[in-house]
Swiss-Prot record:
Residues 286-295 have a biased composition (Pro residues). It comes from the Eukaryota. Residues 184-193, 237-251 have a biased composition (Basic and acidic residues). Residues 212-223, 253-264 have a biased composition (Gly residues). Residues 545-555 have a biased composition (Acidic residues). It comes from Homo sapiens (Human). This is Cerebral cavernous malformations 2 protein-like. Belongs to the CCM2 family. Residues 164-193, 212-295, 544-571 are annotated as: Disordered.
Length: 571
């Protein structure tokens, strides 16, 4: 009876049980004692989740996620917008124990976003898991798998699973214990800022701006973790520049990184180490189905799998990444055009400004792709550097846009007519001034100043050219523009209309956001077609300038008189 009474007491824990099973109690106590700092964030509102670009350029935002895994050497043909492809890959990874079957508190992480990079750190000790430069991100996708809301980042092979030799697990052996006998190391002030700054330097070096400095410093990069790691250079840019890549080490005789002690990513560690194989390799001696089959590193990519709280959190993260794409790639396009000697490039679109009702989510998956290619000719540059919002599986990046063939064919005819007229009426410098005026107007110049500048540029003898700009004025300014034409003596009808009389306003439904794309309104297909038409106009106008420069050098200023004579014949 006494035994039964003792057994029935509540709250009593046997000392033997406490000695045999100490982990559960310690783990619960440890979890309860850990205090997590508030995230460095700000509220954003659906459906657009717009943020001031200066915050992403000069600061960063933090979002709480769960880090599920980092899949390396995934075929690059994987469509991030395809729900079936992603689910099949995730199921295969779970079967191979590459991804966990369920989420736990130990997977809590912080996703830190800035214009230069994405940082992934553990939530408790804030050890760095991944540093992903923006130029390494190919796409960001949202996928709902049963009760899980997954955020999938498709990146290049240059992103290392464990950067700078730090252990990827919380409390891992790779942490720096600090001075002996000292207190546990707390979060350093400015850690996230330092990491974002370092990645900004690595990002500039990756484009060829600092290779000499990196090699002079020993090839170890500038981060604190990389200095602690010593010989191993596992940063994405540093490893490619200093040592040969993992694929070259396996197929080219070891390269220059074989003496570094640790091989590269997870697949390389499994191949190089005799006893360090993963769980799947210990159970199966054959090849891993997730390992590369085609001997070409360009045919593969990496996937970072994150879990978020709900759909809104996933949409917010995708929208932020999409805005990062716009900031970085839009700035690069402007810099490339400036280096080429031009004075204009089209303002990047924001096609993610779409409400949920306007987009179909039949498969529950959508992706934001960054199809980046730095080209010398910026014909349709807003298509080159824009981020794509696709509601269904899109086999082609550009194919996801709405088709505007009817408007494009009519716009092409209008464009050709206007280009022929401008070539015969304006000199090279005047064409460049026209392009600058059009750029300023699209960036917010009032219609009054724009019309005054055009009239001053054309002069009284060529003011009829203003009539040709009528199809390219948005609805909110068309009233003032027509009144301005009547005020300077240009009326529709009569001899002045012979040049542009057949040009009608075919895009009456086009909103002002098609010309000034940085307002908060969603763009319809007609607005996007109108925006592309304006970009083609300015591109072709600038393309005329180099040819006319040669003609201007050969012909003295007396050619201006010939132009006036041509105007008389034209009229």
């Amino acid at each position: 009876m006494e035994y039964e009474v003792k057994k029935g007491k509540k709250g009593f824990v046997s000392p033997i049980r406490r000695l045999v099973f100490p982990k559960a109690g310690r783990r619960a106590a440890c979890r309860s004692s850990v205090s997590r700092r508030p995230l460095h964030s700000m509220p954003l509102y659906p459906p657009d989740y717009l943020i001031d670009p200066q915050i992403l350029l000069c600061d960063y935002l933090e979002k709480e996620v769960k880090f599920l895994g980092h899949l390396t050497w995934v075929t690059s043909s994987l469509n991030p917008s395809s729900r079936d492809e992603l689910l099949q890959l995730l199921d295969t990874a779970r079967q191979l124990k590459e991804l966990p079957l369920k989420t736990t508190a130990e997977q809590d992480s912080i996703l830190s976003l800035s214009a230069r990079c994405l940082l992934l750190t553990w939530r408790d000790n804030e050890e760095l898991i991944l540093r992903i430069p923006t130029h390494e991100i190919a796409a960001a996708s949202y996928l709902q798998d049963d009760a899980l809301h997954l955020l999938v980042l498709k990146t290049g092979l240059g992103v290392d699973p464990v950067p700078a030799g730090v252990d990827a697990s919380p409390g891992g052996a790779g942490r720096d214990p600090g001075p002996p006998g000292g207190a546990p190391e707390k979060r350093r002030v400015g850690t996230a800022e330092r990491r974002h700054t370092i990645c900004s330097l690595d990002w500039r070096m990756g484009w060829g701006g600092g290779a000499a400095e990196a090699r002079a410093g020993g090839g170890g990069g500038g981060s604190l973790e990389r200095q602690r790691a010593g010989a191993r250079a596992s940063g994405s840019w540093e490893r490619r520049q200093t040592f040969s890549g993992s694929w070259e080490r396996r197929h080219g005789g070891g390269g220059g990184g074989g003496g570094a002690g640790k091989p590269g990513g997870s697949w390389e560690r499994r191949q190089a180490g005799s006893g360090g194989g993963g769980s799947w390799e210990r159970r199966h001696p054959g090849p891993n189905p997730l390992d590369p089959q085609d001997p070409s590193p360009d045919a593969y990519c990496n996937l970072v799998i994150l879990a978020v709280a709900n759909r809104d959190a996933a949409e917010e993260s995708c929208a932020l990444i999409c805005q990062v794409f716009q900031i970085i790639y839009g700035d690069q396009s402007i810099e490339c055009v400036d280096r080429a000697g031009y004075h204009y490039t089209s303002t990047p679109e924001r096609p993610w400004l779409c409400s949920r009702s306007e987009s179909c989510h039949t498969d529950g998956t959508y992706a934001y792709d960054a199809d980046f290619s730095c080209c010398s000719s910026f014909n349709g540059s807003q298509d080159t550097f824009e981020a794509c919002y696709s509601g269904t599986s899109t086999p082609s990046f550009h194919g996801s846009h709405c088709s505007g063939s009817d408007h494009s064919s009519l716009g092409l005819e209008q464009l050709q007519d206007y280009m022929v007229t401008l070539r015969s009426k304006l000199g090279p410098l005047e064409i460049q001034q026209f392009a600058m005026l059009l750029r300023e107007y699209r960036l917010g110049l009032p219609i009054q100043d724009y019309c005054t500048g055009l009239l001053k540029l054309y002069g009284d003898r060529r003011k009829f050219l203003l009539l040709g700009m009528r199809p390219f004025i948005p609805d909110q300014d068309i009233g003032y523009f027509e009144g301005f034409l009547e005020g300077v003596g240009i009326r529709e009808g009569g001899i002045l209309t012979d040049s542009f009389g057949r040009i009608k306003r075919s895009m009456s439904s086009t909103s002002a956001s098609a010309v000034r794309s940085y307002d908060g309104a969603a763009q319809r297909p007609e607005a996007q077609a109108f925006h592309r038409l304006l970009a083609d106009i300015t591109h072709d106008i600038e393309a005329l300038a180099p040819d006319d420069d040669d003609d201007d050098e050969d012909e003295p200023r007396g050619s201006r008189g010939g132009s006036d004579a041509a105007e008389d014949n034209y009229l």
